[in-house]
């Protein structure tokens, strides 16, 4: 069983090399750099913002017309869509780095992916294609289990569903879009999760944002992790419930704030809360941290709350058979009231699911805006998911699924260990395939991405507003399809680019 010992979280699980029956997981896997780093980063961003604001004023007053202040003359009299800070940041900082975001791919996003080459000659306002393409090692796609292929049993199953059912179901679940394929994949997912029932939706973001309002209302209380995904935040806002934010992955802080809130009344109704919903994620997509699930289950049981677990990045990616953080920690899935996950990442399809008791899932079927008004998941996407889940559960008669899970775990541990040995500051837990490398400076993360592309390696550069203004980072997404040769080549390139950009903010760790 998972649990806590001496303030450290402990879980059960096995790895291929020297089984680890007790994995000690740091509860604060986000180490801080030297004290002066944030001061220097603050100075850097302040100077850039002051320069941007001065340029904006000069342009507005007609003193100097900058090339960066390009706009549509037909919209000069329009009110701006965003606030002045966002506009200044976008025009003078973000736009200069648009070459490292929204990169167009022209092939299957596997371990190797093709990118369309492009350049800008107007400070990022437009990108022009060169007519050539580059093959790069792919560290940007969420292809955790390596199911993103254009051939093989999953692709064949998807093609067979097109032949049999076509592309579109033609309506919502409550109208004529309730397809037999939906019931089949929902049954498969429920069995995989070891819950009573499940329901699928055609979009992962909407699985959260459109369904949370069906679970709580303005008389309810939501306890939400500070770093929860935007889809969860949107769902909380749409629900109208009073939302209290607790410190990241801190069940004790969650309990304190829950207890304080229960001593009062809902500020929206003036009455006692009618229900409480705690919302957490399995793996946090920008930090790479694995949730301390046993501690949150303990809080849920103590206060009779509903527990909502978003496994967008953890389903398929952790656990001996990829069943997510409940399996990883050795917890009973039925202690989690709503198990949400996306089908776009580990299973290389599209959409999302919710799993739980039949009573909860039937409630969602009846009251969710997604089932009432949204069109349904496409048959070939369903086939891709169903085949991938069967492989991961071992019901295809092979050991492929388990080997994928083992390989992903080995890749995650090896890559993280080697980055730390080189002196990089890396966020997240050792078993997480989401690997953030901290650069802190937005200027450094942009240059880091550009230089990695010269080594034919595609990475994700992340900055504000996806992260705090002073905490820009590179994010590597590992896959079971990455070979050791891939990882060693990447590590050599990362070390070289790290020296060129000055991004060694960690302490060299020789042995972990």
Curated annotation (Swiss-Prot):
Pfam families: Aminotran_1_2
Superkingdom: Eukaryota
Keyword Transferase in annotation: yes
GO CC, any one term: membrane
InterPro entries with a match to the protein in the record: Aminotrans_II_pyridoxalP_BS (IPR001917), Aminotransferase_I/II_large (IPR004839), AON_synthase_class-II (IPR050087), PyrdxlP-dep_Trfase (IPR015424), PyrdxlP-dep_Trfase_major (IPR015421), PyrdxlP-dep_Trfase_small (IPR015422)
CDD domains tied to this protein: KBL_like
GO biological process terms on file: ceramide biosynthetic process; sphingosine biosynthetic process
Gene3D superfamilies: Aspartate Aminotransferase, domain 1, Type I PLP-dependent aspartate aminotransferase-like (Major domain)
Positions where N6-(pyridoxal phosphate)lysine occurs in the chain: 345
First-level EC class: transferase
UniProt keyword annotation of Transferase present: yes
Alphabetical UniProt keywords: Acyltransferase, Lipid metabolism, Pyridoxal phosphate, Sphingolipid metabolism, Transferase
Catalytic activity: L-serine + hexadecanoyl-CoA + H(+) = 3-oxosphinganine + CO2 + CoA
Pathway connected to this protein: Lipid metabolism; sphingolipid metabolism
Protein name, per record: Serine palmitoyltransferase 3
Gene name of the record: sptl-3
């Amino acid at each position: 069983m998972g649990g806590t010992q001496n303030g450290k979280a402990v879980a059960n699980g096995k790895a291929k090399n020297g089984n680890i029956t007790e994995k000690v997981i740091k509860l604060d896997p986000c180490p801080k750099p030297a004290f002066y780093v944030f001061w220097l980063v603050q100075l850097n961003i302040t100077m850039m913002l002051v320069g941007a604001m001065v340029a904006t004023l000069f342009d507005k007053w007609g003193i100097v017309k900058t090339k960066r202040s390009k706009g549509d003359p037909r919209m000069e009299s329009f009110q701006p869509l965003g606030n002045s800070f966002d506009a200044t940041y976008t025009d003078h900082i973000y736009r200069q780095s648009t070459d490292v975001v929204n990169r167009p791919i022209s092939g299957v996003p596997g371990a190797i992916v093709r990118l369309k080459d492009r350049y800008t000659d107007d400070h990022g306002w437009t990108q022009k294609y060169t007519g050539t393409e580059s093959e790069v090692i792919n560290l940007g796609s969420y292809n955790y289990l390596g199911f993103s292929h254009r051939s093989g049993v999953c692709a064949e199953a998807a093609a067979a569903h097109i032949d049999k059912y076509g592309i579109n179901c033609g309506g919502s679940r409550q109208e004529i879009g309730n397809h037999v394929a939906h019931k089949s994949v929902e049954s498969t997912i429920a069995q995989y999760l070891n819950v009573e029932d499940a329901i699928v939706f055609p979009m992962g973001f909407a699985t959260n944002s459109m369904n949370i309002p069906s679970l709580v209302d303005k008389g309810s209380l939501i306890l939400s992790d500070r770093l929860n995904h935007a889809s969860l935040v949107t769902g909380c806002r749409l629900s109208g419930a009073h939302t209290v934010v607790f410190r990241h992955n801190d069940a004790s802080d969650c309990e304190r704030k829950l207890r304080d809130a229960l001593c009062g009344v809902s500020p929206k109704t003036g009455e006692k809360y009618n229900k409480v919903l705690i919302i957490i994620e399995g793996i946090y997509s920008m930090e790479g941290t694995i949730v301390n699930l046993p501690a949150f289950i303990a809080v849920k049981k103590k206060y009779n709350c509903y527990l909502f677990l978003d496994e967008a990045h953890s389903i398929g990616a952790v656990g001996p058979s990829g069943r997510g953080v409940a399996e990883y920690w050795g917890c009973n899935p039925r202690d989690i009231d709503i198990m949400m996950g996306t089908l776009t990442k580990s299973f290389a399809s599209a959409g999302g699911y919710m799993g739980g008791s039949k009573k909860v899932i039937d409630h969602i079927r009846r009251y969710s805006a997604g089932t009432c008004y949204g069109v349904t998941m496409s048959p070939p996407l369903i086939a891709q998911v169903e085949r991938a889940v069967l492989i991961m559960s071992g019901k295809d008669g092979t050991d492929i699924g388990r080997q994928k899970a083992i390989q992903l775990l080995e890749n995650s541990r090896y890559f993280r260990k080697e980055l730390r040995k080189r002196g990089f500051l890396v966020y997240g837990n050792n078993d997480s395939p989401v690997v953030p490398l901290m650069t802190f400076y937005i200027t450094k993360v942009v240059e880091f991405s550009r230089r990695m592309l010269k080594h034919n390696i595609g990475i994700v550069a992340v900055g504000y507003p996806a992260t705090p203004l002073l905490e820009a980072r590179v994010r590597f997404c590992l896959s079971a399809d990455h070979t050791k040769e891939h990882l060693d080549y990447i590590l050599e390139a990362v070390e070289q680019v790290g020296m060129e950009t000055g991004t060694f903010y960690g302490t060299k760790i020789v042995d972990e």
